[in-house]
Amino acid sequence: MKPTGTDPRILSIAAEVAKSPEQNVPVILLKLKEIINITPLGSSELKKIKQDIYCYDLIQYCLLVLSQDYSRIQGGWTTISQLTQILSHCCVGLEPGEDAEEFYNELLPSAAENFLVLGRQLQTCFINAAKAEEKDELLHFFQIVTDSLFWLLGGHVELIQNVLQSDHFLHLLQADNVQIGSAVMMMLQNILQINSGDLLRIGRKALYSILDEVIFKLFSTPSPVIRSTATKLLLLMAESHQEILILLRQSTCYKGLRRLLSKQETGTEFSQELRQLVGLLSPMVYQEVEEQKLHQAACLIQAYWKGFQTRKRLKKLPSAVIALQRSFRSKRSKMLLEINRQKEEEDLKLQLQLQRQRAMRLSRELQLSMLEIVHPGQVEKHYREMEEKSALIIQKHWRGYRERKNFHQQRQSLIEYKAAVTLQRAALKFLAKCRKKKKLFAPWRGLQELTDARRVELKKRVDDYVRRHLGSPMSDVVSRELHAQAQERLQHYFMGRALEERAQQHREALIAQISTNVEQLMKAPSLKEAEGKEPELFLSRSRPVAAKAKQAHLTTLKHIQAPWWKKLGEESGDEIDVPKDELSIELENLFIGGTKPP
């Protein structure tokens, strides 16, 4: 039922939330913060505003927004942190009225759990952040979320037990970062100062986990802030609850705790709390009755445990025996099946051998009966013919085997020879290129220095040559024409050399292609071993070659299919004309690699 006299600002916000799309809802809900901040704290007007917010399901909208992924919310962590403040302030001091059961049993635990989940997400983002400014901003948002959770727990103490038992809270407490860890431990200290009685109402496992984490941070963290907070937490737990103090004294899990605390530095800021904690954990005179009780309790637990294990083992004995019998029978049946199969195979082999012997005996009897019909003078001739036929068959098989063996050996050696030639050709070509590069890029070494005697001798030879071959004087115009002719011939030479190099490269490419084709033909399988795709490897990649091959194939077919009287007078070198229509049949179906479709 909607309350009367609702604040018009709440009505307008609720109407905007109902009409706006989902992505705009978080920004609209932030308007509630302005309304709450300008209203005096503790006034009846603020209480009425909180009731209106709850009645129009704006708190539920805040919960739904906080349960979404932070990356999808407009404004990111800034919007989320402000929504946590709005949610905590609205839930504290609210009188739900008729929906009190739903509010206390569902909404408040869900809000506390959402705050813890947001804390874990902020912790993960803080750890993954690389920049210091981003870390400071995330730490500020984390502090806002923890403050909102503490504000909510301060107004609803019954939620402390749920928070302490939550796995998310334990994960936050196990943070290795100094800032996150100190913030969580300060929140735990403030929670225990509000109501430490809930610490004994939580499960044994959760209590041990909290104690283990606090003690671990006390001894393993070098940060004095975390160590001071951990010491204060342990002191607060031990002073508030005698059960926890007894647990820290007598439990085997915390054996040697006092000795480790005594070794801590005494000049620190928390040395006073440390001394108080050591004093609480100092050994006292334990009564023999308590030790005897503990011993009897341990013996009783062991007896019950051993009895339970024995009864459990006895219950499993029949099933174990049944399983053993089943496995034994299955193995025995498999063994019998194997023995029967072996016997059947042996019987089959024996029957085949007997049939073979029987057939051989019948064939020999038939031969003897046929020999009885033959004239006695022809028997020796028959035996001689049989021996010759047998010898010929043996020789034929032996020669075939020898030729096949020699062929395979020669084929392998020929392949190796071709490979060696190819490698040598490639190596020689590579060395020639290297020598050519060295000649092109070789530095100028200058001329060898001449001796005085050699210089005089050369000068004398030049003077003699000039004296014997007096040249006619050449004009400047003739000299220039001669120079132009020389340049033209030099240019013609260089252009011809480029064409010769291209022709040489083309010849080398053709030789390499021919070598590849020869090697491919040598490696070609026999007709019996050939598969469907292997003949496609021998199709030419050149259209003229493919057309010429098609023409030769059709010529051969026409020559074979022609009647005998048409072949009279033909010579082996004569060519047969093939129509172009027949030549173009299926030519487009040939695989021509390296070409583009028209």
From Swiss-Prot:
Repeat among keywords: yes
Residues of the region (Interaction with CEP290, BBS1, BBS2, BBS4, BBS5, BBS7, BBS8 and BBS9) are: 287-598
> One Pfam family for this entry, by name?
IQ
Q: May I ask which residue range the UniProt record assigns to the signal sequence?
A: none
* Induction details: Down-regulated by DNA damage in a p53-dependent manner.
InterPro entries, per the entry:
ARM-type_fold, IQ_motif_EF-hand-BS, IQCB1, P-loop_NTPase
Keyword Phosphoprotein applies = yes
What GO molecular function annotations does the UniProt record carry, in alphabetical order? BBSome binding; calmodulin binding; enzyme binding; protein-macromolecule adaptor activity
Q: Where is this region: Interaction with BBS1, BBS8 and BBS9?
A: 1-157
The record's subcellular location field reads: Cytoplasm, Cytoskeleton, Microtubule organizing center, Centrosome; Cytoplasm, Cytoskeleton, Microtubule organizing center, Centrosome, Centriole
Q: Which UniProt keywords apply?
A: Calmodulin-binding, Ciliopathy, Cilium biogenesis/degradation, Coiled coil, Cytoplasm, Cytoskeleton, Leber congenital amaurosis, Nephronophthisis, Phosphoprotein, Repeat, Senior-Loken syndrome
Q: What is the tissue localization of expression for this protein?
A: Ubiquitously expressed in fetal and adult tissues. Localized to the outer segments and connecting cilia of photoreceptor cells. Up-regulated in a number of primary colorectal and gastric tumors.
Modified sites of kind Phosphoserine: 572
Q: Which GO terms describe its cellular component?
A: centriole; centrosome; cilium; cytosol; extracellular exosome; photoreceptor connecting cilium; photoreceptor outer segment
Which residue windows are coiled coil?
A: 336-373
Q: Where is the IQ domain?
A: 294-317, 318-338, 387-416, 417-437
* Region Interaction with BBS1, BBS2, BBS4, BBS7, BBS8 and BBS9, residue ranges: 530-598
Any GO BP annotation: cytosolic ciliogenesis
PANTHER family per record: IQ CALMODULIN-BINDING MOTIF CONTAINING PROTEIN 1, IQ CALMODULIN-BINDING MOTIF-CONTAINING PROTEIN 1
Q: Could you describe the subunit structure of this protein? A: Interacts with CEP290/NPHP6; IQCB1/NPHP5 and CEP290 are proposed to form a functional NPHP5-6 module/NPHP6; localized to the centrosome. Interacts with calmodulin, ATXN10. Interacts with NPHP1, INVS, NPHP4 and RPGRIP1L; these interactions likely require additional interactors. Associates with the BBSome complex; interacts with BBS1, BBS2, BBS4, BBS5, BBS7, BBS8 and BBS9.
General function of this protein: Involved in ciliogenesis. The function in an early step in cilia formation depends on its association with CEP290/NPHP6. Involved in regulation of the BBSome complex integrity, specifically for presence of BBS2 and BBS5 in the complex, and in ciliary targeting of selected BBSome cargos. May play a role in controlling entry of the BBSome complex to cilia possibly implicating CEP290/NPHP6.
Tied to what disorder? Senior-Loken syndrome 5: A renal-retinal disorder characterized by progressive wasting of the filtering unit of the kidney (nephronophthisis), with or without medullary cystic renal disease, and progressive eye disease. Typically this disorder becomes apparent during the first year of life.
Please state what the annotation says regarding this protein's domains. Answer: The IQ domains mediate the interaction with calmodulin.
Q: Could you identify this protein by its name? A: IQ calmodulin-binding motif-containing protein 1
Organism listed in the record: Homo sapiens
Gene name of the encoded protein: IQCB1
